[in-house]
């Protein structure tokens, strides 16, 4: 057992460190989502790996058919958890959990949602706004770019109350304003 006050590693490094296609894909994700390093991609992969493992265990439980009510309860619990997190749609099934890819996880990060909502010009600027305390969720300042935003919190993302960006005439904010539909999903 380890020391309980110390954080453990929340990601798993690749088994083959010099695999060209993987490196190119990770580099593309780092650039597209404005990540600091590939460790953030690996964290997202590990997070999804846990969900997929739970889904595979549920499928194994279903095939054994020992207790159908236990299977249904665990299935609905997993699906509803992932729907609240915003990773799955309303009519999702276990197959949708197994089909999830890393970009789905990276789209739920605060940094990405700040950029998608048009509060920043680029993913890198979105990261900077978050770390400098200019972004709030539901009125509470959040300074973690990797914070996973739930569906309920998604609509409450805005500039923090004491941030100079609250003023619409702020010089940087006028540069951020884009035409409708440009880069926003």
UniProtKB/Swiss-Prot annotation:
Residues 108-170 form the S4 RNA-binding domain. The keyword Cell membrane does not apply. One of its GO terms (biological process) is ribosomal small subunit biogenesis. GO terms for molecular function: rRNA binding; structural constituent of ribosome. GO terms for cellular component: small ribosomal subunit. PROSITE patterns: RIBOSOMAL_S4 (PS00632), S4 (PS50889). One of the primary rRNA binding proteins, it binds directly to 16S rRNA where it nucleates assembly of the body of the 30S subunit. Part of the 30S ribosomal subunit. Contacts protein S5. The interaction surface between S4 and S5 is involved in control of translational fidelity. Belongs to the universal ribosomal protein uS4 family. This is Small ribosomal subunit protein uS4. The gene is rps4.
């Amino acid at each position: 057992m380890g020391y309980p006050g110390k954080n453990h590693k929340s990601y798993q490094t690749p088994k083959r460190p010099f695999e060209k296609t993987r490196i190119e894909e990770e580099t593309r994700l780092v650039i597209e989502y404005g990540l600091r390093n590939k460790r953030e991609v690996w964290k997202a992969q590990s997070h999804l790996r846990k969900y997929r493992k739970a889904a595979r265990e549920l499928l194994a439980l279903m095939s054994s058919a020992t207790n159908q009510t236990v299977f249904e309860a665990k299935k609905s619990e997993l699906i509803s958890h992932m729907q609240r997190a915003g990773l799955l749609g309303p009519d999702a099934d276990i197959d949708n959990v197994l089909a999830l890819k890393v970009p789905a996880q990276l789209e739920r990060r605060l940094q990405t949602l700040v950029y998608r909502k048009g509060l920043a010009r680029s993913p890198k600027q979105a990261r900077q706004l978050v770390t400098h305390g200019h972004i709030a969720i539901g009125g509470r300042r959040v300074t973690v770019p990797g914070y996973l935003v739930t569906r309920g919190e998604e609509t409450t993302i805005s500039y923090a109350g004491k941030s100079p960006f609250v003023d619409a005439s702020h010089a940087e904010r006028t540069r951020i304003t884009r035409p409708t539909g440009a880069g926003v999903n």
